From Swiss-Prot:
This is Protein phosphatase type 2A regulatory subunit RTS3. Residues 1-62, 149-176 are annotated as: Disordered. The keyword Iron does not apply. Residues 46-61 have a biased composition (Low complexity). The lineage of its organism: Eukaryota, Fungi, Dikarya, Ascomycota, Saccharomycotina. May be a component of a protein phosphatase type 2A (PP2A) complex. Negatively regulates SIT4 phosphatase, a modulators of caffeine sensitivity. It comes from Saccharomyces cerevisiae (strain ATCC 204508 / S288c) (Baker's yeast).
């Protein structure tokens, strides 16, 4: 009985302790639960705690976006300006090239004295004659090569003299005469006679048709003396023939024996 009473008392004390301890826990939890929502739901604390932390971050974000947009606009403006300048330079170059195509620059400027004159080129003599008919360059053919043009300067006279020398040279070569005949045409005209008149005396020859202007007023005795001098000069130059053949020299010696000029 004693053991049972003690056990009952111990059980009662433990139950009483548990009952006393429970309301304290419940009071603490109720107080804490009542305090926590009041602190969390206070609008003043929410405004004071959240506004200073959120406003500078949003301001920084807005400023960075505006700066990026401004920088992009500046870059686009610079690109547009550069492209406009390139377009202007290309337009100027295009207009300059068009002007050069429509109005070509002359390669060389001619003197005003020869602007309205045309050059006539001779293939053999390379002598130039100028006429006043057309401003273009002309090349003459073989038929009109030796024609005399009106209003020709000094070069055309040299052209005529060269052509006369060329014709006399060709005639001397075809007849088998020496270079001395072409060098001294006056003495060949005076002392050379055709084949039919070789046996005639010198007095019967028609001197008036063969004498040049400078010898027209000279007597026959003077002519014979001058003819002898010319034949001496001709004798010195007769050693040179065109091709160095002995047949031409023999012909010349025969001519001199017939005319009686050989001493």
């Amino acid at each position: 009985m004693i053991a049972t009473s003690r056990a009952v008392n111990m059980n009662k004390e433990s139950k009483h302790k548990k009952a006393v301890a429970k309301p304290c826990r419940e009071r603490q939890t109720s107080v804490t639960r009542a305090m926590r929502p009041a602190v969390a739901r206070d609008p003043r604390r929410l405004s004071t705690s959240s506004s200073p932390s959120s406003s500078p971050m949003s301001a920084q974000r807005r400023l960075s976006r505006e700066e990026i947009i401004n920088e992009m606009e500046k870059e686009q403006d610079a690109i547009v300006v550069r492209l406009l300048r390139e377009i202007e330079t290309l337009k100027e170059e295009n207009s300059r090239l068009k002007n050069q195509l429509h109005h070509p620059v002359p390669a060389r400027r001619s003197s005003p004295f020869f602007e309205g004159e045309s050059a006539i080129l001779d293939d053999d003599d390379c002598n130039y004659g100028y006429t006043l008919d057309t401003p273009k360059l002309k090349l003459t053919d073989g038929a009109s090569r030796h024609t005399v043009l009106p209003l020709t300067p000094k070069d055309s006279m040299t052209h005529i003299s060269h052509s006369a020398r060329r014709s006399s040279r060709n005639a001397s070569i075809s007849n088998g005469t020496s270079i001395s005949d072409t060098i001294f045409p006056i003495e060949t005209k005076i002392h050379s006679a055709p084949t039919t008149n070789r046996n005639l005396p010198s007095a019967d020859l028609p001197h008036h048709t063969l004498l040049p202007r400078s010898l027209s007023g000279i007597s026959s005795s003077d002519l014979t003396e001058s003819g002898a001098l010319l034949h001496d000069r001709r004798r010195r130059s007769s050693n040179y023939s065109l091709d160095g053949s002995n047949s031409l020299k023999a012909d010349l010696m025969a001519k001199r024996f017939q005319t009686g000029s050989l001493k």
